[in-house]
Amino acid sequence: MPRRKQQAPRRSAAYVPEEELKAADIEEDNLEDDGLSLDVQDSEYLYNDEHEIKETPSYQNSPISSATNQDAGYGSPFSETSDHLADFKSTSSKEGQDKEDGQNTENVSYPTDSLAQIKAVYTNLLSECCWSNLALDLKKSNENSSPTTNTNKSSMSEATGSTSDPDTPTTIPSSSCTNTSTSISVTTSNSTNSNSASGYDWHQAALAKTLQQTSYGLLPEPSLFSTVQLYRQSNKIYGSVFTGASRFKCKDCSAAYDTLVELTVHMNETGHYRDDNKDRDAERTKRWSKPRKRSLMEMEGKEDAQKVLKCMYCGHSFESLQDLSVHMIKTKHYQKVPLKEPVPAITKLIPSTKKRALQDIALPDSPEQAGISPGASVSESAKDPKAANPYVTPNNRYGYQNGASYTWQFEARKAQILKCMECGSSHDSLQQLTAHMMVTGHFLKVTNSASKKGKQLVMDAVIEEKIQSIPLPPTTHARLPGSYIKKQPDSPTGSTHSEEKKDPEKEKVNNCEVEKRIKEENEDPEKIEPATLYQYLREEDLDTSPKGGLDILKSLENTVSSAISKAQNGAPSWGGYPSIHAAYQLPGTVKALQPSVQSVQIQPSYAISVKTMTPDHNSLIHSPGSLTPPTHRSNVSAMEELVEKVTGKINIKKEEKVLEKEMVIPAKPPSPVAKENKEILKAEEANGKVLKKSNEADIQKPKKETPIEPHALNGTEPLKAKVTNGCSSLGIITDHSPEPSFINPLSALQSIMNTHLGKVSKPVSPSLDPLAMLYKISNSMLDKPIYPTTPVKQVESIERYYYEDSDQPIDLTKSKNKPFVTSITDHVSSPLRESALMDISDMVKNLTGRLTPKSSTPSTVSEKSDADGSSFEEAMDELSPVHKRKGRQSNWNPQHLLILQAQFASSLRETAEGKYIMSDLGPQERVNISKFTGLSMTTISHWLANVKYQLRRTGGTKFLKNLDTGHPVFFCNDCASQFRTASTYIGHLETHLGFSLKDLSKHSLNRIQEQQNVTKVITNKALSSVGGLIEEDSSSTFQCKLCNRTFASKHAVKLHLSKTHGKSPEDHVIYVTELRKQ
């Protein structure tokens, strides 16, 4: 049996005889037997109907009832199905029915057609007494014209209307079933006590038409939801009159009651309050739990409910959310739901008529191909009834049929689903993909690229195809099938069209090269030798595949990624470090003349590893993370030229000639890019080096070489000597901090360009190429080295790199020093360049503010110098404490912390019991601290509040422990001394500061300004000795127009404006006056 027969709605005891209620209870008991067939139960149910009808008065001679089925012209399908039963209803008195009750019921021949039973049921429903008032006028008009030949047939329908339809999804309002003798005054004399009246023709005719036109395709075997497809009708067909007037309804059987007491009595009698979810395995295929529940299928429609209330693991649909929840809890399927495949973005943008064709192309071949596409119809998926799944819905948005087919698809397409969106590498599990994302930082790239959707339409479609459709699963060693490549899921930018248009021959070439690289990569993974020639890409490999350049570079990215993972797993192949963390430790001493080039692994937001190669291999190996945004055609054309050049299509002599022409006549923006790259290749080949390039190096260089355009515009020569910036020394390696170390990719690439360009110098006229803007960005973001000042020697390119030992980690949070050193000291520093660099600096800070972790060293105000050493850094820390960068205490000026800690210790009050009580600093003390340190009152308040919170929560902070125990211990940050009393601690801190806290108010801002001026003089001397470029005139100071305070640098004024006055740094021109010193 497909489902349990639904019980008839119960009427209130005030309107239904007790015998009828008892009969209904007997009927419910009979329906509990689930082993009977559909026909037997239906006949049994009709028997119960007949039993109730015989106890109810019947009025066959009514002219209204005789007109029930004949006027609409539908051939009275209901009366035909009732012929067998009408013969037993010829008696018009209740007594006659009682006499014949025991004699005739066993001889009744019942219809076996379930559709005919449904029609009979609805006939009974529509002849209910509650409709008589509404249809009175219609009945009057039909009285005279209707024949009376079918009186017995229609009166049977009326009589059975005294019982409710057991299959209707709504409730008959019992309050309307009153004595209607006054309303039916037009009937014959027999209609004196009418508890059951006639139905109407218009509604019955409409229902007959609906039933005749509806075809119910029965499956050969009953399924879980066949009853829903067969019997359940939406209540929207009948309008709002079926909603019922009673307020209290039984959820199980939909019986309606006027009072809560009656509903409670019903619940107790029938046990309908019990939980029906106790399905036994044997019964699960025969019936369904909670059949009368008001479900989403009734309210919203069957298909929508099946789409929403579907188990993602096994594919079963459910009538209500409660059933789905019970299923999930019982089967634990919520723990087994696999990773859902990404929905192609292209399907959201195209009409549904085109979705099927795209899905046929995009999905891999599978046994369920015909039924899994979102646009597929039910008829397609049900061509083979035994293969078709009964849970398939027409609008299956998840693209699978059931648990088995979905699992098959997931396994078959796991390499595509668990794929890094950035580099295309596939993984065997979600954990491996997560680890890959964390190691490479690709999650940041994907996030950033996803936020820039819609801005990448400038790229050539052909190049977009090449870039987005490169299948590179480095963890897959077997040859990939052709359908795997053709039908991979869309990338986040939606590349379905590009995949359809890809050239299959080019795919073959690319895939061969990819597999070749993968095999080379995995041939000897455990070798420790850093100089293994065939482990990385060679120029010979590039020569063999002129068309597959992009794929080769992409494969090299994966090779480098695998090297990183090996390093983290303890089996490095590049430097002999036991782990990647050991690579961050500074060696004790490094030979000064060691010419090795340090190659920095660059990521979008931080450095993954630092590789130190032997002197024989000055190779630059970069990570997969490419910082190039594909936003301009010139980038693409430059890349194409670069690939052609690397593959040997253009010889070097021709490049030299073009380079000479380029010095005189500036051409299109991509041209100088390619020419300089060719010059780089020539220089490297002349030195006999084995060049190992990566995608980042090749694609970023075009952006970094146009720097020379604005440089030459301002009358300066390009770089001729290697600068002691971050990428030329181990000083770039930072110590361990809670956050990942950040190496500026732009500055690292600039140093690479400095390395390769060496003595290349050519003046180029400025062009409108947006690539030129990146030069300014790189200038403003170059990392600051912290080394003792040493003059940079003009030596040959092989001996230009020195490793300088320094204990001080580099401050990577400020882009204040741009170390550019040239052999020409007569440079021009134009105001235009100065202001442009400041604007670019502001823009870069806005772009990279959240990605830049805070440094563990104190940062300083000055951002105006182009080169600096650690001695000047320390001097400025001591002498210019104004406007420090606020944040964690690790970024604070130690002097400021000493002052704040001393003031806090002085505010502690000792009680008679020997304990200390925290008291707040007075406003005057705060003002004194603010005047001396330059810290805002808000910053001071926040620091104090943070210290108090830590003391209350844990009883201690960095400089004070055990305050709550009555035996506090004070710690000095400078010398790690410990003190037991606040007075001795304050005295000790004053010795570090060099003055007493009482004298703090005597120090004015003028003293601080003088110290800044002294620092400026020292810095200027250092810059003149190094010959660096100075952005600002050393004889100028800047005054805030709002408060008339003066500052030594523009950046200090802008910090002041933003922190003190809340002004945007971009508005500094409005609020700043530049003062020239005489």
UniProtKB/Swiss-Prot annotation:
This is Teashirt homolog 1-A. Coiled coil: none annotated. The lineage of its organism: Eukaryota, Metazoa, Chordata, Craniata, Vertebrata. Residues 271-286, 497-524 have a biased composition (Basic and acidic residues). Gene3D superfamilies: Classic Zinc Finger. PROSITE patterns: ZINC_FINGER_C2H2_1, ZINC_FINGER_C2H2_2. CDD domains: homeodomain. It is found in: Nucleus. Belongs to the teashirt C2H2-type zinc-finger protein family. One of its GO terms (cellular component) is nucleus. A zinc finger (C2H2-type) spans 248-272, 309-333, 418-442, 970-992, 1038-1061. Signal peptide: none annotated. Probable transcriptional regulator involved in developmental processes. May act as a transcriptional repressor (Potential). Involved in two major neuronal regionalization processes: primary anteroposterior (AP) axis patterning of the CNS and segmentation of the cranial neuronal crest (CNS) development. It comes from Xenopus laevis (African clawed frog). It comes from the Eukaryota. Residues 1-110, 140-197, 271-300, 365-394, 472-524, 850-877 are annotated as: Disordered. The keyword Transcription applies. Residues 57-71, 853-862 have a biased composition (Polar residues).
